[in-house]
Amino acid sequence: MKRIIYCILVLVIIFNGTGCKKESKPEDNFIKVYDDANGNKHFHPLSITTSESGDGYIVVSAFDSWRIQIMKIDNAGEFQWNYELPSNYVNAVPNLLKINGQNYLVCMDAIGLFTYVLKIDEASQNITQVSSFSDVLYPTYAYNSGQHIYIQNYDRMSFETGIHELSGDLSSITQSGSVNIFTDVEERIVNHITYNNNRIPFFISTTQNQNYIVMNGFYNYSFSMIFLNPDLSFAGVYNGQGFNSGASAISPISGNQFSIARFSYDNLYFNPNVSLSPTTIDITSSISAQGQSELDPGRSVLIKDLVIGGTSYKAYLSSTRSNQLLLSIYETSGGTLVGKKYLGKNIPITASDFIQTEDEGLNILVQAKIMGSIDRIALMKLSKEQLETIID
């Protein structure tokens, strides 16, 4: 990646919003599309996090199906460097692990299908292999709860969804659990990791007090949201209707309260404050939620905490059927919608990830489709002032 395309568009048109209360500096808000020197690669951005050095951000993307690229940008979104991992490392899970300020990547071996844990070495612009787990096939998600580190996977031999807790140094597995799918879903997994059709919304989370782990994956002939005890034994489940419904994203609030997005066939539903029972056996369609007919249920939904004007909110980032983004802001305690903003107008974009910046703005990682068919990594920056106008 040798150059950056700066989209020659007025920001107010790109962001499709109103003016700010105060004049923002040029670096406070922007959109940048990162081009590739070869021009023929298709990129799928996966995750953005702060750099180890604190002077920018690390972006992990897939390209040409399941290959992996790491990119470093500075705080103003300027390209610094990129590194394409050797071809044996594939299928990066869609989030980075941050442990003691350092960034780690979980991925898969292209031939053996087993799991690697890699450390991103910013100084050398390279990666260091930390560990490999030959019995953990098809990794699908990784999560650091602050107390424990987990990897989710699909076992193609036993038709099970597995979850594995790692040691603090990431060198070994301390305990494992699994749930039985009772059917072969390998074709669905392969389509997921090679970006052939829509991605599957795997995730791992916990209740706010970490009494339970929440895992979204295949279970009992369906796509299900499974609650696990701390020893990774089964506690309860919200089953999907086969593979046509289930949870899309979740974010803990307190106790057993969550913000959730769920899908059912061709529709998305949001509930920013709902009580879930970790020991129930139920179906996801029983979770009360409001329909979002303008949104594309086949695209990623992200739910994270977002601080605006000193107050913490729940932010939902989703993709519309018309190839825009929708940023919806809800009160954390009551779940009231306090504002929303549509982003993007001139080029089709899809939500990938977002992260709040040190200056209380928001970096939004997206896939931008240039000239109708060229998939590129792009970054949209909303300033603190722009966020404040959303909740006015």
Regions found by a protein language model. Name each.
Residues 25-44, 69, 78-85, 125-135, ...:
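Aromatic (tryptophan-biased) beta-strands that constitute blades/sheets of beta-rich domains
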Residues 35-68:
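Beta-strand-rich domains and repeat architectures in extracellular enzymes and scaffolds
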Residues 350-392:
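Blade-level signature of beta-propeller repeat domains, shared across WD40, Kelch, NHL, RCC1
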Residues 48, 58-60, 70, 81, ...:
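Hydrophobic strand positions within the blades of repeat-based beta-sheet folds
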Residues 69-77, 115-125, 161-171, 223-231, ...:
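Beta-propeller blade signature
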Residues 1-46:
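Bacterial Sec-dependent N-terminal signal peptides
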Residues 42-50, 89-98, 134-147, 184-206, ...:
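Repeated scaffold domains used in trafficking and secretory/extracellular systems
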Residues 63-67, 109-114, 155-160, 218-222, ...:
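Short glycine/acidic-enriched loop and turn motifs that connect beta-strands
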